């Protein structure tokens, strides 16, 4: 994201009794009165792996954006070598880390509720935040979300492990993460941990009250369309967008179509 309005910065939060530095970046409109959208990255993502999509979206909407790297990702505090994530790791990001970040940056979610835009694991975290804090969001855009574990997902994550071990994927991730092993193995190990096979947030998301746009590609290698259709069954105000010629990353595969859909969605929700 070298063309961003501001370089990445850092803020310290207290997470479970320990200090954690989070990498973050402001993009888009300078005015505090502009609507705010917070970007939550995928399971191997970071601030820089969004590339220019946050800037493009905020420019189209006239909004300001907050992009951040979760603990263990990007240049945020890495995962300790012996640290293993639990089955509730996405819940903890939604219920603990994201609220702490917003508070540290003095974002008043009661006075001016933000929007969330999440991708993959970040989309699941956004759904969990919206379910826990239903009065503190203006709306939600989720790209390739997970609401339960599918066999397709696990097969692709198993393949990702082989790719990481036997190709130059580690070096490629090293361009975006200070510690690529922290990012990769934290994500890969928990998803392939046998108890995680039963992970589901299908019941929890019924508490969501804000408008929701759920987006998925027809060629998503990490989930079937039942993921977003399952959201629509449980959150009736959900608008679905199923994109052809699109894999797991709609913002990379179909950015123009996605931005147009978000513009229409946010205009209708205003």
Task: Map each language-model feature to its residues.
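Active-site loop/oxyanion-hole signature of alpha/beta-hydrolase fold enzymes
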Residues: 67-114
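Conserved hydrolase catalytic core segment
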Residues: 112-150
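Short beta-strand/loop motif that positions the catalytic acidic residue
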Residues: 208, 214-216
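Catalytic active-site module of serine/aspartate enzymes centered on a nucleophile-bearing elbow/loop
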Residues: 239, 244-270
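Acidic catalytic loop of the alpha/beta-hydrolase fold
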Residues: 219-223
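Active-site nucleophile elbow and catalytic-triad environment of alpha/beta-hydrolase enzymes
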Residues: 187-204
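Conserved HGGG/HGGXW glycine-rich cap/lid loop of the alpha/beta-hydrolase fold
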Residues: 27-80
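A short loop-to-beta-strand scaffold at the N-terminal edge of the catalytic core in hydrolase folds
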Residues: 17-28
